[in-house]
């Protein structure tokens, strides 16, 4: 992801290093297959596509937790509301904020902010529906859209530590301290209705 050259013509982009998480990796694979085999326009009157997507890799999750001193949450018993409040009031890394500012300039639709965790890579333990997804409306004000987007990203990060997520991770014999979260930002597809 290059803040100087990114445009809405880019169908799938990655911000940062580290894992894409299971969901994003699957979407990237499907996108490459659609392009490679020209399936997106192969059938008359049918358009197959993956919504324009940007993935925030796990590097930024690690940075966010470390720079805001949030690791203590792993060993504490806070309510979901307390965790969400702590995360939303924390600051995302500058480089990520700048990349998202560049991205938001190209957005003209509502957005889905989706989880894509490292544990979603598991072949034997499904994690579908465990973490949060947030929908944000399109607002014709870049600053307001950016604020909504930043809050949604932090909220997805917080969902790693919610009670239901913790319980599921423990039941799957995984460790909460080893979980890492990537975030998928996707345009919402559809037709506006009156």
Please describe what each predicted stretch is:
Residues 1-42, 91-194:
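Conserved mixed alpha/beta core segments that line enzyme active sites in large multi-domain catalysts
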Residues 81-95:
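Metal-assisted phosphate- and nucleotidyl-transfer catalytic regions
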């Amino acid at each position: 992801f290059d803040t100087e050259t990114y445009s809405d013509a880019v169908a799938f982009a990655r911000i940062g290093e580290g894992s894409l998480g299971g969901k994003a990796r699957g979407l990237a694979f499907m996108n490459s297959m659609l392009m490679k085999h020209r399936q997106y326009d192969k059938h008359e009157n049918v358009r197959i596509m993956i919504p324009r997507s940007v993935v925030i890799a796990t590097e930024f999750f690690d940075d966010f937790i470390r720079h805001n001193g949030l690791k203590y949450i792993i060993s504490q018993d806070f309510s979901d509301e307390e965790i969400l409040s702590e995360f939303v009031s924390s600051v995302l890394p500058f480089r990520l904020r700048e990349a998202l500012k560049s991205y938001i300039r190209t957005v003209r639709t509502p957005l889905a902010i989706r989880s894509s965790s490292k544990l979603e890579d598991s072949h034997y333990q499904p994690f579908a529906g465990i973490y949060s997804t947030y929908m944000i409306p399109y607002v014709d004000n870049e600053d307001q859209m950016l604020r909504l987007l930043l809050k949604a990203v932090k909220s997805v990060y917080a969902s790693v530590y919610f009670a239901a997520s913790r319980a599921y991770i423990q039941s799957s014999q995984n460790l909460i301290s080893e979980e890492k979260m990537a975030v998928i930002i996707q345009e919402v597809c559809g037709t506006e209705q009156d």
